[in-house]
UniProtKB/Swiss-Prot annotation:
Pfam families per UniProt: Complex1_51K (PF01512), Fer4_7 (PF12838), RnfC_N (PF13375), SLBB (PF10531)
Main location: membrane
Keyword field contains Iron: yes
Transmembrane segments: none
Stored PROSITE patterns: 4FE4S_FER_1 (PS00198), 4FE4S_FER_2 (PS51379)
Cellular component annotations (GO), alphabetically ordered: plasma membrane
Protein name as it appears in the record: Ion-translocating oxidoreductase complex subunit C
Binding annotation for [4Fe-4S] cluster 2: C387, C416, C419, C422
Single GO MF annotation: 4 iron, 4 sulfur cluster binding
Residue ranges constituting the 4Fe-4S ferredoxin-type domain according to the UniProt record: 369-397, 407-436
Length: 676
């Protein structure tokens, strides 16, 4: 009974809410085998073909490259891209890529040489002897990404799963109309796909491996069953055809009955999902040693004469693939990259094929029908009934149209998988997916701006905190320096105290002189001589300063000379008028007169040696000379009119008269010199 229940649960499948059943339109392209496309003359390889940042360039313009040669380096989540063929790098510049707005991204442009030479390939046939880390690194460096449409780096996804993965799901549903790339790959390369699944299982070591495939692919189902005939570790689950059963959350629920939590990932419930195309790329990377340089692309639509599935080199222009398939465009021809529900219209055909390109749809006017005008929402709730994510598309539409980002976020717009089921059933022909895509892009931009603002605020606060810490540390250092002297200051203070103590000790010690010896006073004498020399040097410096000040001002010098002469004459007059009983020693008088004359000559010499630019005013000099002559005449007259009882020594009078005449003569000469 338990075995029966276990077997029943093993094959049980669940059903999700919502979903639609549009026309499949798969028979146009799934009936012919995979074929190769002739090489294009020029390849455009965008550096970013996956979720995450672009890699670092490792080639330059003019370099020769081989097929499989890395064009960028992959570090962290950055996935490298590789040359799709051999040739020459002719440019590295922005180029329009696979995007609804054909945004330009940095790309490497290669001109093919037609030889299509590979780099040396090193396959790992013994991959089971390799460690988990080695296999993940090889998968990452060979550029393998999710080929089901998301483009998430496979190596990063495997690394993030860790040891908590219990169920490995291989997505082979391919539920969107027109697309048959995975269907044809399983028909033609079923053994290689299974080998890639085994490599993934060796890395993850899951408890069970499930392949989910819709029942509208009978040939692929039969091929997989034939390859898995002797395998008991891989289970093939055939599920009913329903759109969008190929969604990650929807297929997880169908096969396991587990729901991925809101805002979480499938790895949170022990599930990891990979696409069949990704499994095939893993096999070629690990066993064959070939980086991902091509993928299967469906070429379909009534505007294509030879629809089918082709091996398209990454970087091949869309125009080249369509022309090879017999593209017959109409006047208003539309080309869609992807399916009719989740794809987008290309603005022009020069965009390249990338890793997430699974279909190129060129429908005729009859296939699409007449375009319907968008009308107002009638709140019929048909979109809510069809939504596989259990959302309220009509409410999200109003929030998106009214720029109510908070309410849109509250109503879980991030859980929208953009499957297009709501727009398919809308009777008002409202392009709901376009509104939701735009709203999610605006919310992402707002969050990115908020993140940048928060980071800038954190940097500012960290800087302010650092400055405050430095200021506090600086104040603390200043306080410590004020309270405690530095080490060198302590040493200097200690040395000074030691010297003082030594001198005090020497002063208190008595001087003992032995008999017959003389005391040694050489140190005292040397100190005394040093003090005398220092005093003389200081006095000489002071004298030089005074002399310089005297020479610097010629008028001051002249005034001092006049004062000296007046003092000399006053002294002579006092001597002449002295009473007879107060006779002055003639030798002393002669000495004083000689000193006065010497001072006068010194002052005149300093005045004569003054700087040329410091000349005395000639008029002032003439006035001084006239005053000196007048004073000399007055002195002579006073001497002549002196009373008889006050006889003056005739020699002194003669000396004074001679001095006066000499001074008058010098003043006159100085006047003549100044006038010249």
């Amino acid at each position: 009974m338990l075995k029966l229940f276990s077997a029943f649960r093993k094959n049980k499948i669940w059903d999700f809410n919502g979903g639609i059943h549009p026309p499949e339109m798969k028979t146009q392209s799934n009936g012919t085998p995979l074929r190769q496309v002739p090489l294009a003359q020029r390849f455009v390889i965008p550096l970013k073909q996956h979720i995450g940042a672009e890699g670092e360039l490792c080639v330059s313009v003019g370099d020769k490259v081989l097929r499989g040669q890395p064009l960028t380096r992959g570090r962290g989540k950055m996935l490298p891209v590789h040359a799709p063929t051999s040739g020459t790098v002719t440019a590295i510049a922005p180029h329009s890529t696979a995007h609804p707005s054909a945004l330009a991204e940095l790309s490497v442009i290669i001109d093919a040489d037609g030889e299509d030479c590979w780099i040396p390939r090193d396959g790992w046939d013994d991959y089971r002897s390799r460690s988990r880390e080695e296999l993940i690194e090889r998968i990452h460096q060979f550029g393998v990404a999710g080929l089901g449409g998301a483009g998430f780096p496979t190596g990063v996804k495997l690394q993030g799963g860790g040891d908590k993965i219990e169920t490995l799901i291989i997505n082979a549903a391919e539920c969107e109309p027109y697309i048959t790339a995975d269907d044809r790959l399983m028909q033609d390369c079923a053994a290689q796909v299974v080998e890639g699944i085994r490599i993934l299982a060796h890395i993850l070591q899951p408890r069970e491996i499930l392949i989910g495939i819709e029942d509208n692919k009978p040939q692929a189902i039969s091929m997989l069953r034939a390859v898995l005939a002797d395998s008991h570790d891989i289970s093939l689950r055939v599920i009913p055809t329903k759109y969008p059963s190929g969604g990650a959350k929807q297929l997880t629920y169908i096969l396991t009955g587990k729901q991925v939590p809101h805002g979480g990932r499938s790895s949170d419930i022990g599930v990891l999902m990979q696409n069949v195309g990704t499994a095939y790329a893993v096999k070629r990377a690990v066993i064959d040693g070939e980086p991902i340089t091509e993928r299967v692309v469906t070429l379909t639509g009534e505007a294509i004469a030879r629809p089918g599935n082709v091996w398209a080199r990454l970087g091949t222009p869309v125009r080249h693939l369509l022309n090879d398939a017999g593209f017959c465009p109409s006047a208003d021809q539309m080309v869609i990259m992807g399916g009719p529900l989740m794809g987008f219209t290309l603005p022009w055909l020069d965009v390249p094929v990338v890793k997430i390109t699974n279909c190129l749809l060129a429908p005729s006017a009859n296939e699409l029908g007449e375009p319907q005008e968008e009308q107002n929402c009638i709140r019929c709730s048909a979109c809510a009934d069809a939504c596989p994510a259990d959302l309220l598309p009509q409410q999200l539409y109003w929030f998106s149209k009214g720029q109510q980002h908070d309410k849109a976020t509250t109503h879980n717009i991030a859980d929208c998988i953009e499957c297009g089921a709501c727009a398919w059933v809308c009777p008002s022909n409202i392009p709901l997916v376009q509104y939701f895509r735009q709203e999610k892009a605006e919310i992402a931009a707002i969050r990115q701006e908020e993140k940048r603002a928060a980071e800038a605020k954190a940097r500012f606060e960290a800087r302010q905190a650092r400055l405050e810490r430095e200021k506090a540390a600086r104040l603390e250092r200043h306080k410590s320096a004020a309270v405690q002297p530095a080490a060198k200051d302590k040493d200097a203070i200690a040395a000074a105290l030691a010297r003082v103590k030594e001198k005090q000790a020497q002063a208190t010690q008595p001087i003992v002189i032995k008999a017959g010896e003389r005391p040694d006073n050489s140190a005292i004498i040397a100190a005394r001589e040093a003090r005398k020399a220092q005093a003389r040097a200081k006095q000489a410096e002071l004298q030089q300063t005074n002399d310089a000040a005297t020479v610097a001002d010629p008028r001051k010098t002249a005034v001092e000379a006049a004062i000296a002469r007046a003092k000399a004459r006053k002294l002579e007059q006092q001597q002449a008028n002295a009473e007879p009983e107060q006779q002055v020693d003639p030798r002393k008088a002669a000495v004083e007169a000689a000193i006065a004359r010497a001072k006068a000559r010194k002052l005149e010499q300093q005045q004569a040696n003054a700087e040329p630019e410091q000349q005395v005013d000639p008029r002032k000099a003439a006035v001084e000379a006239a005053i000196a002559r007048a004073k000399a005449r007055k002195l002579e007259q006073q001497q002549a009119n002196a009373e008889p009882e006050e006889q003056v020594d005739p020699r002194k009078a003669a000396v004074a008269a001679a001095i006066a005449r000499v001074q008058a003569k010098k003043a006159a000469q100085q006047k003549v010199v100044n006038e010249d």
